[in-house]
């Protein structure tokens, strides 16, 4: 295993002379040279083997400890090897659920829309694709089945360690137009709470008119057009507080303004946003902790780091990022760069990107370093390093100084996909920009960036991304689970 055994020199015994030849009754037997040599070499070999075995045991123990440590880091996938294959393929009814990426108890959990238009909350084993349980929330719907709107994104969120809350509705869209498909309005909207271990329905209550939901411990915050935002007891639906967003102003239609309002959870805060206009922040009691401020470029909530970033655009068209912090916000140039995996090895780090990559201390707003690299996707933070994809490859930078540790390049005419890691390597698709050439999955060593292995992705898979503990292969019409 990369270790050399060192042979020791051994002195072999020659003939042994008797003190007095007259005392010898018969000739002394010849020394058994071969046996002495064999045992000596065997002892040395055994020692060398023991050293090798002991060293390997230590290395294996360290690797298992590292695997266990990284397995506890959100976003790190299970160890991958050079034999890349499709372990299971979600049917159409489960594809949206898998891509939504809500994981509990080792399963993808969320809403599923079947071919007959019925809806259910489902748990699908991440490793095997087996449906563990399915709890129906709406029966067959012929109209929905005709147009088969399977959109379920943002409908479910974890409410506790073993509880999933979902906003379910019988509205859907007609996809018979190229743009702006008309919506069939809901006649039944409810909040359901399901035990993720067995699918048992914990609560099922009405939520008339709600179109978005944010979940905090014991609280469902619902946004409903024309009705404002209400904080309700998650189990009973009892109203705890109400928030009415400010008027749109003379330059916006109030009806259009209120119909677009959405809510989202950001740690222990709730955001109330009108996309392209403003973001307000409330705490769990409904108290306004941040008045609506312009955020015409939107917002980012990074679950890996717990960072809430509000994005705005200057008059010159440049994007700026405001990091929301208790007591003191931090205003930074550039667009907040998402971090999909963070093991905490570079504390208080925030990254922004435009024509350059910048690192900041989120506590003080001071610049740590600037790199000429231009990030093309979310970053990974592991072992004190920052890993980012660019248009030409993958770069590893020292998290403290920004110095380049290593750089890899993709094949000519190719671009890298999003970065993932199994805690041993950086996993990234080397994918063609155009044409039918096959993509490859490449595993780069975390330390030196050398390819550990590379393998063609199965037919029809162009790129890959990490969701939960699995690596997904992305196809033209959905995703498959790779192993």
Where are the regions a protein language model picked out?
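Secretory-pathway ectodomains
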Residues: 2-483
């Amino acid at each position: 295993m990369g270790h050399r055994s060192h042979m020791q020199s051994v002195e072999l015994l020659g003939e042994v002379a008797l003190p007095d030849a007259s005392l010898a009754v018969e000739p002394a037997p010849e020394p058994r040279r071969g046996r002495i040599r064999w045992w000596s070499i065997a002892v040395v070999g055994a020692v060398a083997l023991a050293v090798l075995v002991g060293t390997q045991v230590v290395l294996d123990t360290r690797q298992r400890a590292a695997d266990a440590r990284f397995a506890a880091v959100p976003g790190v996938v299970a160890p991958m090897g050079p034999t890349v294959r499709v372990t299971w393929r979600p049917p159409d009814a489960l594809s949206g659920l898998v891509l939504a990426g809500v994981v509990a108890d080792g399963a993808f959990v969320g809403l599923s829309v079947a071919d007959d238009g019925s809806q259910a909350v489902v748990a699908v084993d991440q490793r095997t694709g087996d449906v563990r349980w399915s709890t129906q929330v709406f029966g067959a719907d012929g109209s929905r089945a005709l147009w088969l709107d399977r959109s379920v994104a943002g409908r479910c969120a974890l409410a506790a360690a073993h509880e999933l809350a979902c906003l379910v509705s019988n509205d859907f869209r007609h996809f018979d137009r190229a743009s702006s498909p008309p919506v069939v309005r809901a006649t039944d909207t409810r909040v359901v709470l399901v035990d993720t271990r067995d699918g048992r329905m914990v609560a099922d209550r009405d939520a008339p008119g709600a179109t978005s939901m944010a979940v905090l411990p014991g609280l469902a915050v619902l946004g409903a057009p024309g009705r404002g935002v209400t904080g309700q007891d998650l189990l009973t639906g009892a109203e705890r507080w109400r928030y009415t967003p400010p008027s749109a102003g003379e330059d916006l239609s109030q009806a259009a303004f209120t119909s677009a309002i959405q809510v989202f959870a950001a740690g222990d805060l709730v955001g109330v946003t009108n996309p392209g206009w403003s973001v307000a922040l409330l705490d769990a009691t409904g108290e306004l902790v941040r008045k609506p401020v312009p955020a015409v470029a939107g917002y980012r909530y990074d679950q890996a780091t717990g960072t809430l970033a509000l994005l705005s655009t200057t008059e010159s068209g440049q994007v700026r990022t405001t990091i929301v912090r208790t007591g003191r916000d931090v205003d930074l140039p550039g667009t907040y760069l998402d971090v999909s995996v963070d093991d905490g090895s570079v504390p208080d780090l925030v990254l922004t990107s435009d024509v350059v990559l910048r690192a900041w201390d989120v506590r003080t707003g001071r610049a740590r370093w600037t790199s000429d690299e231009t990030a093309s996707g979310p970053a990974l933070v592991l072992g004190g390093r920052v890993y980012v994809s660019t248009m030409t490859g993958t770069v590893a930078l020292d998290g403290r100084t920004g110095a380049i540790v290593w750089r890899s390049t993709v094949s000519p005419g190719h671009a890298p996909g999003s970065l993932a890691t199994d805690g041993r390597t950086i996993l990234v698709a080397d994918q063609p920009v155009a044409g039918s050439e096959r993509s490859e999955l490449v595993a780069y060593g975390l330390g030196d960036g050398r390819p550990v292995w590379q393998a063609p992705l199965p037919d029809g898979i162009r790129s890959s991304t990490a969701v939960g503990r699995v690596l997904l292969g992305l196809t033209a019409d959905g995703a498959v689970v790779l192993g």
